[in-house]
Curated annotation (Swiss-Prot):
A family per Pfam: RNA_pol_I_A49
Gene Ontology CC terms: RNA polymerase I complex
Gene of this entry: polr1e
Keywords: DNA-directed RNA polymerase, Nucleus, Transcription
Name of the protein described by the UniProt record: DNA-directed RNA polymerase I subunit RPA49
Main location: nucleus
Source organism per UniProt: Xenopus laevis (African clawed frog)
Taxonomic lineage: Eukaryota, Metazoa, Chordata, Craniata, Vertebrata
InterPro entries: RNA_pol-assoc_fac_A49-like
Length: 419
């Protein structure tokens, strides 16, 4: 029979910091009792983004380590999760649970030059380089700002021959074990991920247009299910209701144009799918026109809360202004919104989307939306169409074809202006 235990949550009081979980990047500590830890906290307790910043320092006989909870080198922990540590007392059968925070410890490597400057005699100064002599003068007679800059530069220097040899040996072992081809492939994938932060997940080797930008990656199944009630008004729209939307200009030109053809769909399942997609697309277009986003701007009576939360999480960034945290639309997030709008519109329009209408709805420059469409692998064609005033004008159409189109950057040099 399995043993049972009761647990008691202690949390972390205002005086204590809770449990600290550390992970050393270069190995495992053999004797943890010989490590001295020091925790530093940010003094600015008024700013909600900096008051929780901490730095943890560890001293050992051989190396010193440092870690923090606010830089890019920290552990990739979800900000939406809380972490705990439990200590089980086998005699009483009780487990005490405490709040925990994780730190990734990095070694601080110095070249040894710092100690030599204090011990070497002045007679040995001619053998030093010009940079070493300047550093010695700064340490003796420099201003506080110069000394801080020098200290920062030395902390960032990794000039140890032992480390270089170890890194070279490790690189040789990795190349021998995995092979050069595999490493080049990994580097290409990493570079592709870094350059596509604002694009929807894309399969450039897709065999069908619908698999290039999969629908579930654009609108999650949870959001899609929640849109059933929200899109009911579009699904059951009448001629009078559509005319009222046109007069009140509640939606953009692209959505209104698709709503005209929505009433001609006889299949109930296809009609419901198009209505949900148009409702979500209309919400993204309205979101792209905002600078500062509040929940009340998105959470309208017909908007599901899960859709509101997803839009705030995926398409806004947190900024600190006027003493409080705000959600805003940055340049990168707006580009991401435009890319998702184009991808969803492709699914709505059988993978041929009128980029000119979307550009006007989002108040973008034509060159900007064409640039994003080209990065997404779309073919751009010009098609003559009639506007509401029966004037013939050229519209840019984006087509998704297999394989996706790859545009090479122009390598032409800029022409010099003649005087």
């Amino acid at each position: 029979m399995a043993s049972r235990a009761s647990w008691e949550y202690h949390g972390a009081s205002q005086q204590s910091q809770g449990a600290l979980l550390v992970q050393f990047s270069n190995g495992t500590i053999q004797s943890p009792e010989s490590v001295n830890f020091t925790l530093y906290g940010n003094k600015d307790d008024k700013n909600p983004k900096t008051k929780r910043q901490k730095i943890l320092a560890a001293e050992t006989d051989r190396l010193n380590y440092v870690g923090n909870n606010f830089s890019s080198d920290t552990l990739k922990c979800s900000s939406l999760c809380r972490y705990f540590v439990g200590v089980l007392n086998k005699e009483t059968g009780k487990m005490e649970v405490y709040d925990a925070e994780q730190f990734k410890m990095q070694p601080i490597l110095k070249s040894g030059m710092e100690n030599e400057l204090h011990t070497e005699d002045i007679v040995d100064q001619p053998t030093k380089s010009y940079r070493e002599k300047v550093d010695a003068l700064i340490e003796s007679f420099g201003t506080n700002k110069q000394k801080r800059a020098l200290s920062s530069r030395k902390l960032n220097q990794v000039g140890s021959d032992i480390l270089n040899k170890a890194m070279a040996k490790a690189a040789e072992e990795i190349i021998e074990s995995r092979g050069t081809t595999e490493l080049i492939k990994d580097a290409a994938e990493k570079r592709e991920q870094d350059t596509s932060l604002f694009l929807p997940p894309c399969d450039f080797n897709a065999d069908k247009p619908e698999n290039a930008y999969k629908f579930d990656n654009l609108i999650s199944p949870v959001e899609y299910a929640a849109l059933e009630t929200a899109s009911a008004a579009l699904r059951n729209i009448t001629s009078e209701g559509l005319q009222q939307m046109v007069e009140e200009k509640k939606s953009g030109l692209f959505v209104l144009q698709e709503l005209h053809g929505l009433r001609e769909i006889k299949d109930e399942k296809a009609l419901d799918h198009q209505a949900r997609c148009l409702w979500y697309l209309d919400a993204l277009i309205k979101l792209s026109q905002l600078r500062t986003v509040k929940r009340k701007d998105i959470l309208t009576p017909e908007c599901p809360s899960v859709v509101c939360w997803k839009l705030m999480k995926n398409f806004t960034v947190e900024t600190y202004k006027n003493g409080r945290i705000q959600n805003a639309i940055s340049g990168t997030t707006k580009t991401k919104i435009v890319a998702y709008i184009i991808a969803i519109a492709l699914h709505i329009c059988d993978f041929q989307v009128d980029l000119t209408l979307l550009q006007r709805d989002m108040k973008l420059k034509e060159s900007r939306i064409l640039e994003i469409a080209k990065v997404m692998g779309l073919k751009i064609k010009k098609r003559m169409m009639y506007s509401e005033s029966s004037i013939e004008e050229g519209h840019k159409i984006g087509l998704l074809t297999i394989p996706l189109t790859v545009y090479k950057p122009s390598g032409g040099e800029l022409k010099r202006k003649k005087m």
